[in-house]
Amino acid sequence: MVVITVPFAALYETMKTIKPSLRTGQIVVNVTVPLETAIGGSAVRTVEVWDGSAAELASRLLPKDVKLVSAFNNVSAELLNNLSKDVECDVLVCGNDQDAKKTVLSLVKAIPGARGFDAGSVENSRTIEQITALLVSLNIRHGVKTGGLRITGMSPDS
């Protein structure tokens, strides 16, 4: 499994660089969100991506036999980097391959406090990536770095 968490401005070159090293059936997890900072703007807005989302762009750039999953887009890096605290966020997992999503949901389950939800096809990344900009805005407004999402009224898939 390869996890891509780079600024949007670096996504294209990163995908081109790793493409020759990827193996058939390998899972690539895209965490990148197309924030406006990629073009000198604000982190509370996204830029429109021709493919629909950063995940769909990444998928187009990958070999057809590599499985793209979008996940962790709405989880603060600050939380994921602090191994002494439970994450206490939900992770929305999108992709077009059920087995690849199940593998990523298993990874989510291994993170203390995190819960994973199968959020459907990679197309749904369009909405999920937009939520990240909103979360950045809320975190700034409330002076925190770790605000995230919790889905209520249903059981997680992980």
Label the model's feature ranges.
Residues 10, 32-35, 75-76, 97, ...:
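Glycine-rich beta-alpha junction loops
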Residues 48-73:
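Rossmann-fold dehydrogenase core element
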Residues 16, 56, 60, 106:
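Active-site phosphate/pyrophosphate- and oxyanion-stabilizing loops and adjacent acidic/basic residues
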Residues 88-158:
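Active-site-lining helix/loop region of Rossmann-like oxidoreductase modules
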Residues 24, 62-64, 111-112:
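Short, structured coil segments at secondary-structure junctions
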Residues 29, 67-73, 116-119:
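General beta-strand structural signal in soluble alpha/beta enzymes
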Residues 1-29, 33-41:
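Rossmann-like NAD(P)-binding element
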Residues 41-51, 56, 82-99:
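Short beta-strand and adjoining strand-loop segment in the mid-core
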